Amino acid sequence: MIERLKKVSLPALSAFILFCSCHYGRILGVICFDIGQRTSDDSLVVRNRHQFKWFCLSCRLISVTAVCCFCAPYVADIEDPYERLLQCFRLSASLICGICIIVVQVCYEKELLRMIISFLRLFRRVRRLSSLKRIGFGGKREFFLLLFKFICLVYELYSEICQLWHLPDSLSLFATLCEIFLEIGSLMIIHIGFVGYLSVAALYSEVNSFARIELRRQLRSLERPVGGPVGRKQLRIVEYRVDECISVYDEIERVGRTFHRLLELPVLIILLGKIFATTILSYEVIIRPELYARKIGMWGLVVKSFADVILLTLAVHEAVSSSRMMRRLSLENFPITDHKAWHMKWEMFLSRLNFFEFRVRPLGLFEVSNEVILLFLSSMITYFTYVVQYGIQTNRL
């Protein structure tokens, strides 16, 4: 059994997790396209599904209408002003997130498809760059991040479905289903952002691996210990590989910047809505625990919400740190030729790396890094302390 586990390819498992997650997003009506294999060369292609897209949009519009009609009166009847305010924030965030998905699917459909096609084309180009045959997605880091994300998705779906067993009538069941459809569907934008940044990190990682192993070996093969001339044919081959590596690196930065610009605002809006929902859920579990028969399950949802933010931040950090790895390889220091064009090429490439460095700055306000995790955790601990003090002062704890 252990020997079989050792033979399992982690990149292949990562690709399987992505395959399952893609179909999960299609069920929730967020992913309205299909990714399949071309019969001629087995490459992945994107196929648009217009009828399925309009069906998903209709379901989301019905869900938004149902939440406004059935959930808003319930929120208006809440007596506690603090809880009513939080529930209003949660309901507003859910509706805004649903509308945000509709806008993305209607107004930015072509841009999304072009971006996904660019990602698939880049992966094919990077695989052709290396002589090593790669199957799957990413490496060990990408696998473990995807595994934790998949566990979060499964727990999220399980927790939401468990809410349906204790509803009194069919109207409550319908309203709850619509609310669940909106909430889980809106969270898929965060998951798509996570996968997108992780894809950028995987692309950078593969190109860095090619430069560190194969390209460096080819550059060393051109060194002449006695200062002899380098063969033109051999130099031309290495120059072609270097040009292709530089071109791929520039293309990854361009596609990553396009992805960030396209999903920057939706991810930020839905992330803020998720934070509101987490604060409300933690408040109710602490102050009104009698409403929940499964308190441990509810605290699991709170932890899962923390994990979503942390995993998204780690994916961004992985992409940013991988984009800076090329400068640390010091490939420009190989004394292979005295041609000025060769050294000028590397100087221009390194200058572009500094100028077009891949960075993630939501709305230009701050740069996403691991410090965001500490800031988020410290703010949530402060909020928990405030809620506990409020419960003690009002004799609810």
From Swiss-Prot:
Tissue specificity statement from the Swiss-Prot or TrEMBL entry: In larvae, is expressed in neurons of the posterior pharyngeal sense organ.
Annotated GO CC locations: axon; dendrite; membrane; neuronal cell body; plasma membrane
Membrane topology: Multi-pass membrane protein
Annotated GO MF terms: ligand-gated monoatomic ion channel activity; taste receptor activity
One of the protein's GO biological processes: chemosensory behavior
Organism superkingdom: Eukaryota
Segments in the Extracellular topological domain: 34-87, 163-179, 288-295, 393-397
Alphabetical UniProt keywords: Cell membrane, Membrane, Receptor, Transducer, Transmembrane, Transmembrane helix
Annotated transmembrane regions: 13-33, 88-108, 142-162, 180-200, 267-287, 296-316, 372-392
InterPro entries reported for this sequence: 7TM_chemorcpt
Coiled-coil residues: none
Major localisation: membrane
Function: Probable gustatory receptor which mediates acceptance or avoidance behavior, depending on its substrates.
Family: Belongs to the insect chemoreceptor superfamily. Gustatory receptor (GR) family. Gr93a subfamily.
Name of the protein this chain belongs to: Putative gustatory receptor 93c
